[in-house]
């Protein structure tokens, strides 16, 4: 399936300096893909002109006169900036001109605009934010990461379904394993919402493996970890802080004296492999699941390499029918319940 990704080129901490080169790299690595660069024409046109011949019809510019600020209130952005690069990118998905949209802009605004323009899929009460993290077994998908602070058991069930369909689509795993994040593996652990969610997941037809603790996000064991947005966001930010601390400690210890500097040289190949495995840029791109269209949120501080990963993540989800998979699963569950 050929995909067209609408790119909010003005969003994020760095804007076109990062997003435009990332679009070029994405098109070079995805020969069948197309991209629509959305943003201020006077800014983007000079950047795109030098590669116009290389990409031809695979890359076009869609003018948008406004930009959503990183600290702007979502309601304000939705009401007052209907020609923002973020809004126009989502509108392109709604109209069918694009099969996915990617933005590094304001998360709250992106979720609000996406939900308003695209609407949620049948059977989905609330969209959720899902991302992939490195684990000992390969990678683990976690949701929700902050879109929904307070959740019902039914919401957590829907997150499990959407997460499983995401992994099935992009990792090509027929029956992804699903775990429910809890304070212990026993079914009696957790608050009432989590315990009831566990019961719903056990009878859902998903490949549910029961409760998992926080360490299993990284030690592996399940493909999808389900939690509410409060817990998920805390877990994610804690992980990011820990990774930064470990990197700082390694740099400090290896630069302490001549001997440790020599040890660093000897260990360089292993350190390089370690860095590649835990490089957060490789995992950039959180999917906004539950919408009638593929939308991926890049980290606001992403560099060109990281933003390219988000573009690839969006293209993979669209090409592998993520939205249709979720619709089909929700429809099947609705028929079973009837």
UniProtKB/Swiss-Prot annotation:
GO cellular component: cytoplasm
PANTHER family documented for this protein: FATTY ACID/PHOSPHOLIPID SYNTHESIS PROTEIN PLSX, PHOSPHATE ACYLTRANSFERASE
Reaction(s) this enzyme catalyzes, per UniProt: a fatty acyl-[ACP] + phosphate = an acyl phosphate + holo-[ACP]
Keyword Ion transport: no
Lineage top rank: taxon: Bacteria
Gene Ontology molecular functions: phosphate:acyl-[acyl carrier protein] acyltransferase activity
HAMAP family the UniProt entry points to: PlsX
Function summary: Catalyzes the reversible formation of acyl-phosphate (acyl-PO(4)) from acyl-[acyl-carrier-protein] (acyl-ACP). This enzyme utilizes acyl-ACP as fatty acyl donor, but not acyl-CoA.
Name of the protein: Phosphate acyltransferase
EC number(s) reported in the record: 2.3.1.274
Similarity comment: family membership: Belongs to the PlsX family.
Entry-linked InterPro entries: FA_synthesis (IPR003664), Phospholipid_synth_PlsX-like (IPR012281)
Gene: plsX
Cysteines engaged in disulfide bonds, as pairs: none
Subunit structure comment from the entry: Homodimer. Probably interacts with PlsY.
Gene Ontology terms describing biological process: fatty acid biosynthetic process; phospholipid biosynthetic process
Pfam families found in the cross-reference section: FA_synthesis (PF02504)
Major place of residence: cytoplasm
UniProt key word Nucleotide-binding: no
Keyword annotations from UniProtKB, A to Z: Cytoplasm, Lipid biosynthesis, Lipid metabolism, Phospholipid biosynthesis, Phospholipid metabolism, Transferase
Native organism: Azoarcus sp. (strain BH72)
Pathway: Lipid metabolism; phospholipid metabolism
Localization (cell): Cytoplasm
């Amino acid at each position: 399936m050929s995909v067209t990704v609408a790119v909010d080129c003005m969003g994020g901490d760095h804007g076109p300096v990062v997003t435009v080169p990332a679009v070029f790299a994405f098109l070079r690595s995805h020969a069948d893909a197309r991209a629509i660069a959305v943003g201020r024409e006077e800014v983007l046109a000079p950047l795109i002109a030098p590669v116009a011949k290389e990409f031809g019809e695979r890359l076009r510019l869609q003018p948008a006169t406004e930009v959503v600020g990183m600290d702007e209130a979502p309601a304000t952005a939705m009401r007052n900036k209907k020609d923002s690069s973020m809004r126009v990118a989502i509108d392109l998905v709604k109209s069918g001109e694009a099969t996915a949209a990617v933005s590094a802009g304001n998360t709250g605004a992106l979720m609000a605009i996406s939900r308003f323009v695209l609407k949620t899929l049948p059977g989905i009460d609330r969209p959720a934010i899902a991302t992939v993290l490195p684990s000992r077994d390969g990678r683990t998908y976690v949701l929700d990461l902050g879109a929904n602070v307070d959740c019902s058991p039914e919401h957590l069930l829907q997150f499990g379904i959407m997460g499983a369909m995401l992994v099935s689509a992009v990792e090509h795993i027929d029956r992804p394993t699903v775990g429910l994040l809890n304070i212990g593996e026993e079914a009696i652990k957790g608050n009432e919402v989590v315990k009831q969610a566990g019961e719903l997941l056990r009878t859902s037809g998903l490949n549910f493996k029961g409760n998992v603790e926080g360490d299993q996000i990284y030690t592996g064991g399940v493909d999808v970890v389900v939690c509410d947005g409060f817990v998920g966001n805390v877990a994610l930010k804690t992980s990011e802080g820990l990774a930064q601390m470990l990197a700082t400690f390694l740099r400090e210890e290896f630069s302490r004296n001549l001997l440790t500097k020599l040890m660093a040289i000897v260990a360089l190949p292993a350190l390089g492999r370690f860095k590649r495995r835990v490089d957060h840029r490789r995992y950039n791109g959180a999917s906004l699941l539950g919408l009638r269209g593929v939308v991926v949120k890049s980290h606001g501080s992403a560099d060109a390499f990281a933003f390219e990963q988000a573009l690839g993540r969006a293209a993979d989800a669209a090409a592998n029918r993520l939205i249709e998979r979720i619709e089909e699963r929700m429809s099947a569950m609705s028929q079973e319940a009837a």
